[in-house]
Amino acid sequence: MSVAVPSRPRCPKSVLSIAGSDSSGGAGIQADIKTIEALGLYAQTAVTALTAQNTMGVAAVAGTEPSMVAAQIDAVFADIVPDAVKVGMIPSGDVARAVVDRLHAHGACNIVVDPVMVATSGAVLADEGAVSKELFGMAAVVTPNIPEAEVLLGRVARQECRIASEADAEHAAKALARHFGCAFLVKGGHGAHDANDVLATPEGDVCWLRAGRVDNPNTHGTGCTLSSAIACGLAQGLDMPSAVEDAKKYLDGCLRAHLDLGRGSGPLDHMWRFF
């Protein structure tokens, strides 16, 4: 029985992933590459950190020298200029400044920032200086989950913040978008019964993107996958709501495939369309 494999043009759109490496292959650069290629685009990378991790947790993190991160970004833009950029794990303020400097120098567009602060396992992956207002200000959209949005909003408001309802999520998205000057997608996947996300712009426009929650304990790399898929949509010229909606549909398929690997929170099936 033959399998219909989607085709792509000889000169596909490309997406640059600036993120950390995950030795288990489920998140970070590895998840980004799988997502971008599965969606028919060409993946390029700049590695910001090496992590020793598996489905049960993170054992060690080693940040890449900022000069090396900058050199990787320069090398990419000197040849195959990306149509979109996804920024994931930024381990330090120095790396954040290097990324901002080089993306600004190259006039990067369609930047999607996934503010990776804490791994699915609970391990802290970035210091406070890595949350860069300058980087967020360059972004087309920033994609925090609820815990990350609570941290970001707490820093803006200088007090502890909790998101416990859709009204709270909408308020957070609007406040963060206004403060940082870019769109914010607050992801509701941590909810018990649904995966409703809210997208807000600095101008105060709000769009809810609703979906049912997939009952699957294997969620390692969901944030990386969604943000990379959004970048793919933007690279292909979709408007923001359409790019997010398509990305959510792809992620839904990754979860519904129910790949079952590892002894902890396992990885997604990024290739569900092909098998």
Q: Where is each model-derived feature located?
A:
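Nucleotide and nucleotide-moiety/phosphate-recognizing core
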Residues: 68, 94-109, 132, 182, ...
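Conserved phosphate/ATP/ADP-binding segment of small-molecule kinases
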Residues: 126-206
